[in-house]
Design a protein with these regions (language model features):
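Hydrophobic helix-and-loop "lid/oligomerization" segment in the mid-to-C-terminal part
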Residues: 20, 28-155, 175-176, 226-402
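Phosphate/diphosphate-binding loops
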Residues: 155, 159-173, 178
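Generic beta-sheet signal
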Residues: 129, 159, 182-184, 198-200, ...
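Short gly/pro/ser/thr-enriched loop/turn and capping motifs at secondary-structure boundaries
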Residues: 134-136, 165, 185-190, 204-206, ...
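Short beta-alpha junctions and helix-cap segments that line functional grooves
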Residues: 141-144, 165-169, 182-185, 376-379
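N-terminal amphipathic/basic leader segments beginning at the initiator methionine
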Residues: 1-31
Length: 402
């Protein structure tokens, strides 16, 4: 990595850079002498200051931190990976109907597409399923489980969800279906009863915990079945990069390697869906950085789930038809423009509901016309603008959802 190109990846470690005019910011202290030494070694002064403030205060520490050339850990370092891989392998051998069940954000979509594509290329009879945000909500649910049972699905593999699906796991057993859970969210003390529960945050998981996105955990399952992680990374680093950056994972260790390789792949995309999306939204101009994902690609992919058309995004990443990909990319960008219009309308209405000339200590607003898939963005915007906790509630009869 060139030393003067390192700053973008440091910024991405903390997610998209916020507008500094809001809130109160405290700059971390650092040793000026150490920063001067790093600057003399070739880093820009601001990069040197950031590195020192994070404890990477020698050229050796800084280079080790920034280097994407790190070894990939064994997928079997994750608890229950052996059981998960064995059950999936059996399903492939028996030609059982498998469902990869994901989430409607970028991480969940890329995880779903990665594992679905991997299993189909190995002859799997695979259905992908992402719940409708407005009708089903987040994660594995009774409606979905029963629908999949009607389709004769024998094995459900969750990606980026499932770690709290205790009731749904019980329903799977009742219906004679088996469940493999892969997730990256925090675990409760009572895990769902499944064939395997693979999650870096399991309390019994040996240190160090892999802080990776749901797509990263899905990749580890594929790697356990494939055997050659480096070859698999070369094939799927584009999807890994999208999901990891969009989910604001720390860009350290394996995440840094995945994102670094992924950004190189995005500069010359081979997956027709990604190429079509980047062309449609004007993201092909170099340099391709984490900001390209955070500010340009991720909002458009997320729009599919927010606006209730997540199937457009999954088909886009799974299709091999270039003409179809162009059509899907166009649809996705139109959805994003619609999302922006809806968001703007809710924002203006919410601001008009606030008392003029006052600085609120908290904002709680509700309306029955607001779009549930978009209010979260508006709430975040208001919270940042007014520097206070903000709750926007979508009313539906006597119920409200935030």
């Amino acid at each position: 990595m060139q030393k003067n190109s390192a700053l973008w990846i440091l910024r991405a470690t903390d997610g998209c850079v916020s507008d500094l005019k809001y809130g109160s910011w405290t700059i971390s202290s650092y040793e000026q002498e150490a920063a001067t030494t790093l600057a003399a070694a070739g880093w820009s002064p601001i990069t040197a200051a950031v590195l020192c403030s994070r404890g990477y205060d020698t050229p050796e520490k800084a280079q080790a931190f920034l280097s994407p050339d790190v070894p990939l850990s064994s997928p079997f370092a994750l608890l229950d990976m052996e059981q998960a891989a064995a059950r999936v392998k059996k399903a492939l051998e028996r030609r059982e109907h498998i469902c990869v069940f994901g989430d409607y954000d970028v991480d969940g979509i890329t995880a779903t597409c990665l594992l679905t594509d991997f299993l189909r290329k190995r002859g799997g009879h695979v259905t992908s399923y992402i719940p409708a945000r407005l009708e089903e909500g987040y994660g594995l649910n009774e409606i979905a489980v029963r629908a999949l049972h009607e389709q004769d699905v024998k094995l459900i593999i969750t990606v980026d969800c499932g770690i709290t699906a205790n009731q749904e796991a019980a329903l799977c057993r009742e219906l004679g279906m088996e469940l493999v859970i892969t997730d990256h969210h925090e675990c409760k003390s009572d895990l769902p009863e499944a064939v395997a529960v693979v999650d870096p945050h399991r309390k019994e998981q040996p240190e160090p915990i892999l802080e990776m996105a749901g797509v990263g955990v899905a990749f580890k399952l594929a790697a356990a079945l494939h055997g050659d992680q480096e070859a698999l990374l070369a094939e799927y680093c584009d999807l890994l990069c999208l999901g990891t950056v969009a989910d604001v994972m720390p860009l350290t260790g394996e995440n840094r390697k995945m994102v670094w390789q992924g950004l190189q792949a995005l500069a010359n995309p081979k997956r027709v869906g990604i190429a079509a999306l980047m062309a449609e939204c004007g993201a092909m101009r170099p340099p391709i950085t984490a900001g390209t994902i955070g500010y340009t690609l991720a909002p458009r992919i997320n729009a599919a789930g927010r606006m209730g058309h997540v199937d457009i995004a999954t088909e886009l990443f799974l299709t091999n038809d270039a003409a179809r990909a162009v059509s899907l990319a166009s649809q996705l960008c139109k959805l994003n423009r619609k999302r922006q219009d809806v968001e703007s309308g809710i924002y203006k209405q919410a601001v008009s509901m606030l008392p003029a000339g006052k600085s609120p200590k908290a904002i709680v607003l509700a309306d029955e016309t607001w779009h549930q898939g978009v209010v979260g963005i508006v709430a975040s915007r208001l919270a940042e603008e007014y520097s206070c906790p903000t709750f926007l509630i979508c009313l539906d009869g006597d119920k409200g959802k935030a």
